[in-house]
């Protein structure tokens, strides 16, 4: 979605709201496609004395697999959108400033980038997930598996 800001660029105090859905189901993360539902983005662009500030949130329900036990689960992911918009950059190294294309901002690109950068590298069904037994593969969240714990031969004399 491209948002045209020509009606607020030169009007301090003016703002423009946006709300849209974005399909990111084609994005692959570590061999899976967790964003199977549309991402809902909503926010506001406000002109603060000539500086355009975009604030908002992008959210979706992710379909994930636990990295410890393999159990599939769903979790809502909400990503804050917060950046400044400018028609030209003075400092190329500032990642918080998004360049306008004419008087428009590409919200699809902005939301996609924010969502990709906010994705977790490790997904757990719960913080205290015990995972699977390394010997028999039993789910340790359901109870002990019955395997005898191996003693490290280097520590057996202790």
Q: What residues fall within each predicted segment?
A:
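Structured interface patches
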Residues: 1-157
């Amino acid at each position: 979605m491209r948002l045209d800001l020509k009606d607020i660029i030169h009007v301090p105090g003016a703002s423009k709201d946006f709300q849209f859905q974005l399909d990111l189901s084609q994005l692959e993360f570590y061999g899976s496609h967790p964003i199977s539902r549309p991402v809902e983005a909503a926010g506001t662009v406000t002109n603060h004395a000539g500086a355009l500030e975009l604030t908002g949130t992008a959210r979706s329900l992710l379909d994930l697999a636990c990295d410890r036990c393999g159990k599939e689960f769903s979790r809502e992911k909400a990503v804050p959108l917060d950046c400044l918009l400018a028609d030209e950059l003075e400092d190329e190294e500032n990642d918080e400033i998004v360049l306008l294309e004419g008087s428009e901002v590409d919200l699809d690109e902005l939301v996609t980038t924010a969502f990709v950068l906010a994705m977790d590298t490790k997904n757990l069904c719960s913080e205290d997930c015990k995972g699977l037994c390394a010997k028999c593969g039993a789910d340790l969240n359901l109870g002990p598996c019955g395997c005898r714990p191996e003693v490290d031969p280097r520590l057996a004399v202790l």
